[in-house]
Amino acid sequence: MRLINFDETSDWFEAFHRLEALLDKKRSKGKMVVFIDELPWLDTPRAKFLSAFEHFWNDWGAGKHNLLLIVCGSATSWMLDNLINNKGGLYGRTNCEMHLHPFTLAETETYLHRRGVTLDRYDVVQTYMLTGGVAYYLSYFQPGLSLAENIDAIYFAENGFLQTEYDRLFTSLFADNAGYRRIVETLSENRYGLTREALAEKAGIALGGTLSNMLKALVKSDLVTIYWNFGESKRTQYYKLTDMFCLFYLGFVQRNPTNNRTYWYDNQNRSRSEERRVGKECRS
């Protein structure tokens, strides 16, 4: 049921005023829930969405004790800068954060099984290592195909579902994503991670608040992990790329020079042939 015709509203201020009027008409003493999905994408240039949203909550919503406002968004940097760490009209307004994490290895196995994708545990581990347990990526695995056939169809075939996902990932998570990509791609070439200073030098990004904020957003997005080396000072932090999809994409998909659409299947067969050859040499 469409309760508000947004085609007839002149701006976001009017849209929120209409929402207020609609909720006032209900005069409900029970809990009322307003859910706004993908909040960052509503804040387009010159839309003044954030100002209207602040006005809606501070002047009306915050005083409604039976109103629960739930917002979500995949653009991590926007959510951090404009909502969670807001220093303006929305400062300190969030009551609870819910960070959605990917599936664990066990949950990945259960999900695949319930979708009818039959893989042995070795292949389930490989699947987890190239998807990171992200349900969206796992949803493209088709029953009846081997792991190699699924990987080729999803990552390497023409119009493969996840062939361009790397670009979409950064566009959806970060508004100005060039710096984030440089950080991730630099870390992908340094498997043991880098200190903040070494990362700044290798990625060509100046040390300072901008780099710090980008690293915080990457950590919050589960793309990068902070760790400390045993025996070193606690002040020496290392940043390591741990997102499995990015590692697989940068390590294999981006480096597929021949654009071979059966790359993984062929690579698997070559590996098996090499194993058989080595085995014969060892026995002779």
Language-model-detected regions and their locations in the chain:
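Phosphate-binding site recognition
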Residues: 1-269
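Conserved small/polar residues in nucleotide/adenosyl-binding loops
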Residues: 275-282
